[in-house]
Design a protein with these regions (language model features):
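Beta-propeller folds
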Residues: 1-228
Length: 231
């Protein structure tokens, strides 16, 4: 009789447990992507079976073949207490609803070809994680900072919201959409981060090199699809 009661009790609580764990997906790796030479992989994961705040992780092997996992970016470290009470743009909320995305924190990312630069958004802000590699230990040393924060604060009507950011293969630029325009972010340099509006994408650069703008054309197509979804 006790066993039957346990089964009935489990059935009774199953719907709520399934909802609290996002269909039992919390705490499990997701959105994995191999990078570099294929020996490393980026992925997202929260800290527990009922933790909704997802962080960015790296799976890698050392010279002896031992496997390691390193947390690259943690929303709670970047935002503090506000990481548990998200304030995302309406357009991003709509995208998450369509994708049945119930997690918070870092729910998507874009990496360059080497896999050492990754961009993502948290609460509508744009972040960049740079990975340096320790010459002695061979371990990754991640550094995360906000990209172009001053620009976003100076003219939010022009430069926000930050939606669907994608980093260039060489890791030097980021393209995102505001829902109305494409925005190009130049990372770093002597003048710091800079944002410019992209009103058109040419198949050739100033020197007539068609390969230079290939990534922009692809991202423009992705962003166009993203824009149409909100019409």
């Amino acid at each position: 009789m006790s066993e039957t009661n346990d089964v009935n009790d489990a059935i009774k609580h199953f719907p709520r447990l399934r909802a609290r764990t996002l269909r039992f997906g919390c705490g499990a790796p997701r959105s994995a992507q191999t990078v570099g030479d294929g020996s490393r992989a980026l992925f997202l994961r929260s800290d527990g079976p009922e933790d909704l705040v997802t962080a960015l992780w790296l799976s890698w092997f050392d010279e002896s073949g031992e496997h390691h996992e390193t947390k690259l970016a943690d929303p709670r470290e970047l935002l503090g207490a506000t990481a548990d009470s998200e304030d995302v743009p309406a357009e991003e909320k709509a995208r998450r609803e369509r994708a049945r995305e119930g997690g918070t924190g870092i729910v998507g990312y874009s990496a360059d070809d080497d896999g050492n630069r990754i961009v993502f958004t948290i609460n509508g802000r744009l972040f960049l994680t740079d990975i340096d590699w320790n010459d002695e230990t061979g371990a990754p040393e991640p550094h995360t900072r906000e990209l172009a924060g001053e620009w976003l604060d100076e003219d939010p009507a022009m430069y926000t919201p930050v939606l669907n950011p994608r980093i260039a293969p060489d890791g030097e630029h980021v393209l995102y959409t505001t829902g109305s325009y494409l925005m190009l972010v130049d990372i770093g340099g002597e003048l710091g981060d800079r944002i410019t509006a992209v009103y058109g994408v040419s198949v050739e650069d100033e020197d007539g090199n068609p390969a230079e703008n290939t990534w922009k054309i692809g991202l423009a197509a992705v962003s166009y699809t993203h824009l149409r979804a909100h019409e």
